[in-house]
């Protein structure tokens, strides 16, 4: 997605060898016009697949997931990283390791929001090692629902997340694919669109 790649080049900041900071438009402050375009692109790609729910993980996946769900006219569910007292029955959980935060969290979704009839599109902000998507897949499959595809805003193609997910049989669509960081700049790999 050219618009996204341009924004990454303009406002993204490389930290160390493998972290791209995009807090000015995605992971802290949200550019809603960009998220709306991202949502439209995902919706156009997956409209014919019969998606009934969009699922993400809090927090930075929420904005692109909301706009994708809006464009598809289906509900959006986000997995919570912290358990609260109102989620006390029928909880579906999985362990998820965060590459960026270097911690493992138990993420959860109330089972009443997913059913075996659901066809789910997973949307997330980043794909690095694939652990967030893997955890969401486990939760969705616990409900008996089907994962139709995984939509990623920014993929770190130099990490093994895509390979892990595709080998398990899940289609992955990334709007921006980072090939590498070179001399303080992002070098893109050809995106899926």
From Swiss-Prot:
One of its GO terms (cellular component) is cytoplasm. It is found in: Cytoplasm. GO terms for molecular function: xanthine phosphoribosyltransferase activity. Pathway: Purine metabolism; XMP biosynthesis via salvage pathway; XMP from xanthine: step 1/1. It is an enzyme of class 2 (transferase). The keyword Electron transport does not apply. This is Xanthine phosphoribosyltransferase. Its EC number is 2.4.2.22. It catalyses: XMP + diphosphate = xanthine + 5-phospho-alpha-D-ribose 1-diphosphate. CDD domains: PRTases_typeI (cd06223). It comes from the Bacteria. 5-phospho-alpha-D-ribose 1-diphosphate binds at residues 128-132. Homodimer. Keywords: Cytoplasm, Glycosyltransferase, Purine salvage, Transferase. Belongs to the purine/pyrimidine phosphoribosyltransferase family. Xpt subfamily. InterPro entries: PRibTrfase_dom, PRTase-like, Pur/Pyrimidine_PRTase, Xanthine_PRibTrfase. Xanthine binds at residues 20, 27, 156. Pfam families: Pribosyltran. SUPFAM superfamilies: PRTase-like.
């Amino acid at each position: 997605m050219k618009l996204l790649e341009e924004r990454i080049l303009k406002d993204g900041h490389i930290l160390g060898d493998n972290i791209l900071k995009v807090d000015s438009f995605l992971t802290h402050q949200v550019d809603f016009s960009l998220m709306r375009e991202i949502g439209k692109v995902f919706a156009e790609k997956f409209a014919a697949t019969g998606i009934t729910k969009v699922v993400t993980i809090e927090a930075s996946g929420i904005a692109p997931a909301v706009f994708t769900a809006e464009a598809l006219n289906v509900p959006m569910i986000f997995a919570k990283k912290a358990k609260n007292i109102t989620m006390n029955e029928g909880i579906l959980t999985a362990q998820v390791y965060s590459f960026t935060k270097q911690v493992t969290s138990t993420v959860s979704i109330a089972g009443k929001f997913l059913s075996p009839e659901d066809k789910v599109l997973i949307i997330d902000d980043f794909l690095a090692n694939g652990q967030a998507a893997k955890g969401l897949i486990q939760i969705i499959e616990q409900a008996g629902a089907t994962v139709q595809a995984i939509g990623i805003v920014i993929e770190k193609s130099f990490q093994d997340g895509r390979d892990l997910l595709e080998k398990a049989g899940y289609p992955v669509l990334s709007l921006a694919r980072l090939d590498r960081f070179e001399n303080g700049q992002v070098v893109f790999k050809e995106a899926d669109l």
